[in-house]
């Protein structure tokens, strides 16, 4: 993880010019996503995202299941994980389902170049690549963000604070809505 972050930082800072040329060549060959610029997308939330003690009584077992979920990346893996939980413990409560949706949210955020996503107070804030000179800001991933903002100007806005660029999207009260919003962003051209 540390090595990946260091390589990403070098690509975006020290060798940004060289990588920008590489990105131009790559753009002709394939779609450039935010994953080319972000090593990981962290999620912070004020929502209740957990497996309640009533659902999984053993705290050590809950911790193991949280760790396993944190390691998942594909929707198919999350579905298999959910099925295993239901086989063992019964129907997954709503806060557990929301927790499992974080896997998709993190993947979509990374694809769009978000280093962090906050879900707080009914709003979703995506924090983009830290380096303002990064070729990310000329990529298709960021272009999709701009297109989404143009389509929904009353719903979202772009801001820059202390050199950090972010987009705030209003009326996103759940992880499910956040995932649906980012899925829509990824489909825009």
Predicted regions and their residues:
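Accessory helical-bundle/CTD segments and flexible terminal tails appended to RecA-like ATPase motors
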Residues: 1-189
